[in-house]
């Protein structure tokens, strides 16, 4: 099966990595809207338009399924995209909620949602979690992580300063952290290390990763099984510099 993966830039590599490892598909077309990243600071109308333009990009490629790897687009553009599409389109929020349901049985467990400003303001995660009965949900817009990750700053003083700025004021320490932006799994170990080092938690918080969550979701919903004989072919496209995007992919995905 040939599918598409759409993201605002390189953040979708975290989803792509999980898809490649799972080997559920024969061919993957990756489109990063890198000329207009970040999405998280833009208004809902603009994000919806970007989503519809992404659909136009994928039409000639004749894909059978589209994965919206961007949380902001999943929160604000997914429904509009589905209305204008003849193929299934899957976002990353519903799979993450399914992963929570499967792994977190305590409805009072403190859950922290990290995301871009646009994703957090949409309340998509908060509303979905409350519909499932989770009562102790907080959220935090951590948009500055995105440009750091886009610049391949995955460790060091700048990232540490950014984490300190966002996390120091927290009043309730989470047992579960939803990485509500597909960029964030690229610094997941640093986030976990910060919480363990600065808050002396007895156990590491459970990190919900969009990529792993979506693989489980696809296997369950579409009865997909691993193709043991072939590694998926990947083709990269970008609204910006595709050579740069391919270079980042080789570094991060070890292609």
Curated annotation (Swiss-Prot):
Top-level division of the source organism's lineage: Bacteria
Alphabetical list of Gene3D superfamilies matching this protein: 3.40.50.1860
Record key words, sorted: Cell shape, Cell wall biogenesis/degradation, Isomerase, Peptidoglycan synthesis
EC number, as in UniProt: 5.1.1.3
InterPro entries from the UniProt entry: Asp/Glu/hydantoin_racemase, Asp/Glu_race, Asp/Glu_racemase_AS_1, Asp/Glu_racemase_AS_2, Glu_race
Free-text function comment from the UniProt entry: Provides the (R)-glutamate required for cell wall biosynthesis.
UniProt-recorded name of the protein: Glutamate racemase
Coiled coil: none
GO process terms (BP): cell wall organization; peptidoglycan biosynthetic process; regulation of cell shape
Residues given in the record as substrate binding sites: 7-8, 39-40, 71-72, 182-183
Family designation: Belongs to the aspartate/glutamate racemases family.
Keyword Transport set for record: no
SUPFAM superfamilies registered for this protein in UniProt: Aspartate/glutamate racemase
Pathway assignment: Cell wall biogenesis; peptidoglycan biosynthesis
Pfam families from the UniProt entry: Asp_Glu_race
GO MF: glutamate racemase activity
UniProt source species: Helicobacter pylori (strain P12)
Record's catalysed reaction(s): L-glutamate = D-glutamate
Active site: 70 (proton donor/acceptor), 181 (proton donor/acceptor)
């Amino acid at each position: 099966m040939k599918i598409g993966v759409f993201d605002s830039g390189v953040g979708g590599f975290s989803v792509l990595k999980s898809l490649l490892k799972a080997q559920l598909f024969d061919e993957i077309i990756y489109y990063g809207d890198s000329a207009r990243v970040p999405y998280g600071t833009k208004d809902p109308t603009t994000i919806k338009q970007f989503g519809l333009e992404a659909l136009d990009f994928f039409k000639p490629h004749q894909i059978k399924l589209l994965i919206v790897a961007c949380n902001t687009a999943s929160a604000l553009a997914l429904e509009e995209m589905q209305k204008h599409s003849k193929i299934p389109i899957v976002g990353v929020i519903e799979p993450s909620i399914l992963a929570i349901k499967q792994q977190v049985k305590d409805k009072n467990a403190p859950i922290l949602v990290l995301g871009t400003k646009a994703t957090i303001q949409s309340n998509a995660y908060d509303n979905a979690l409350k519909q499932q009965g989770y009562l102790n949900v907080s959220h935090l817009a951590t948009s500055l992580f995105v440009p750091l990750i886009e610049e391949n700053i995955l460790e060091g003083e700048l990232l540490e300063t950014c984490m300190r700025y966002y996390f120091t004021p927290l009043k309730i320490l989470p047992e579960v952290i939803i990485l509500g932006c597909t960029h964030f799994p690229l610094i997941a170990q640093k986030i976990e290390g910060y919480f363990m080092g600065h808050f002396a938690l007895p156990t590491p918080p459970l990190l919900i990763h969009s990529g792993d969550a979506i693989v489980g979701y696809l296997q369950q919903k579409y009865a997909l099984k691993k193709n043991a004989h072939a590694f998926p072919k990947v083709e990269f496209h970008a609204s910006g510099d595709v050579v740069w995007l391919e270079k980042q992919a080789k570094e991060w995905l070890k292609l």
